[in-house]
């Protein structure tokens, strides 16, 4: 087996040494000009156009000085704190009952599917 591998390696080395190295040809020619799509003309009959209108609206009020609340008109959300021990026990009971009901439902379907 070693002789076969050695012969194969020697043949590949001999074949590689006898062939002059040539750089691979390019797969495709480089594009002459960058490809792309031209920009569409600016619309003139739409509510919003390409040109920005930076003048303020005549009925606009002055911007208020933003404090710590920023521009929000809603109340800052309050997150629920840690649940009490009773709430945790109720949660665990509900999860346990749901798991038990799912198990019983699966057993009921298994019994109905059996052939007697």
Curated annotation (Swiss-Prot):
It is found in: Secreted. Keywords: Secreted, Signal. Residues 36-73 form the VM domain. Transmembrane segments: none annotated. GO terms for molecular function: structural constituent of vitelline membrane. The keyword Secreted applies. Its main location: secreted. One of its GO terms (cellular component) is extracellular space. Residues 1-17 form the signal peptide. GO terms for biological process: vitelline membrane formation involved in chorion-containing eggshell formation. It holds the Pfam family Vitelline_membr. The keyword Signal applies. Belongs to the vitelline membrane family. Major early eggshell protein. This is Vitelline membrane protein Vm32E. It comes from Drosophila santomea (Fruit fly). The lineage of its organism: Eukaryota, Metazoa, Ecdysozoa, Arthropoda, Hexapoda.
């Amino acid at each position: 087996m070693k002789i076969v591998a050695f012969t194969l390696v020697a043949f590949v080395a001999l074949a590689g040494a006898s062939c002059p190295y040539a750089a691979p040809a390019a797969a495709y020619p480089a594009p002459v000009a960058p490809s792309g799509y031209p920009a569409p003309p600016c619309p003139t009959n739409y509510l919003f156009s390409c040109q920005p209108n930076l003048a303020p609206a005549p009925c606009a009020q002055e911007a208020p000085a933003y404090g710590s609340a920023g521009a929000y008109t809603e109340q800052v959300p309050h997150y629920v704190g840690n649940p009490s021990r009773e709430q945790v026990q109720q949660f665990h009971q509900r999860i346990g009952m749901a798991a038990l009901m799912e198990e019983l439902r699966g057993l009921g379907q298994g019994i109905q599917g059996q052939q007697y």
